[in-house]
Amino acid sequence: ALAKNAEVGMCRTVAAGLKPGSDVANLSVMGYDPAVCYTGRSPLEAASIGVDLKPTDVALRCNTVTLSGEESYEDKTMVDYCAGDISTEEAHQIIETVEKELGNDIYKFYGGVSYRHCLVVDNGTTDLGNMTPPHDISGRVIGEYLSKSENAAPLIDLMKRSYEILKNHPVNIERRKKGLHEANSIWLWGEGRRPQLENFKEKNGVSGCVVSAVDLLKGIGICAGMETPEVEGATGYIDTNFEGKTQAGIDAFKRGTDLVYLHFEAPDECGHRGEAQNKVKAIEMIDSRVLTKMLDYLNGCGDDYRILIMPDHP
């Protein structure tokens, strides 16, 4: 019924010359020009986990990944970019060990959610060559995707050293016993400096709220001065708390918020994993467990409204 009575069309969320990704695309959807304000993915995620970046700091996304067991690091294969969707509790134990063994006055590691974490480099550079996103090379030998830039060499060394530190970590020993993918290496990418986003309300004349499970979206919201409520059970995957996130959006409207940016990562995550059936299922659950509830509220609240449904990057 919604599609039947709606205006349907296409739009470009990633401008020519920019790498397609959730960071650039969501900034565009929110009305920001990434060509002007985008400084990298990880600084936005860092804001979400409470990392206060100095102007000279460079932040990088630090994935916990599963690599195969070849002796040479370059010969290993990217088995799993998310280490079997590792739990946040397990991942924090991994990152705590990495920080203890590899952290110092220059490198500081911070735990995020599930496999998504952060490295901050003091007085760092963003001129690192091609720091390949791990989800782009699933099933491939990693050697040709390691940056050959001289500036990136210390970071590649951290990745190599992390494998030796983590291959027999207690968390991984237990995951091995259970037949689960191990978080046996870190993978660094998404470098950038602290962003400067114009306040969303000052820019648009309306207040905003971002409801999302992932640090990237929450970080954009924080940097833009928007509300970013925490939702219990929000995982960023197909098992997320669809109803809880929808209710958080409704609660924001009840508090007087003008615009709610309700974001669901599940279809994108299923796509990265090659799970076509789960991607369809995720979209169907957004339809049945999110839109139905939200439209019931909007139709009964007595206010005029507009609703936009779209992917961030097709």
Identify the function of each model-found stretch:
Residues 282-314:
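Metal-dependent active-site segment of extracytoplasmic phospho-/sulfohydrolases and closely related
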Residues 91-95, 155-166, 242-250, 283-295:
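Short, hydrophobic/amphipathic alpha-helical packing segments
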Residues 69-77, 121-141, 224, 246-295:
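Active-site His/acidic residue clusters
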Residues 81-187, 191-193:
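Glycine-rich, mobile lid/loop segments that gate access to catalytic sites or pores
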Residues 15, 70-92, 114, 136-149, ...:
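Conserved mixed alpha/beta catalytic, RNA-binding, or beta-rich assembly cores of soluble enzyme
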Residues 193-282:
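Anion-binding catalytic surfaces of enzymes that hydrolyze or transfer phosphate/sulfate esters
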Residues 1-104:
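Active-site nucleophile/metal-coordination loop of metallo-enzymes that catalyze phosphate/sulfate
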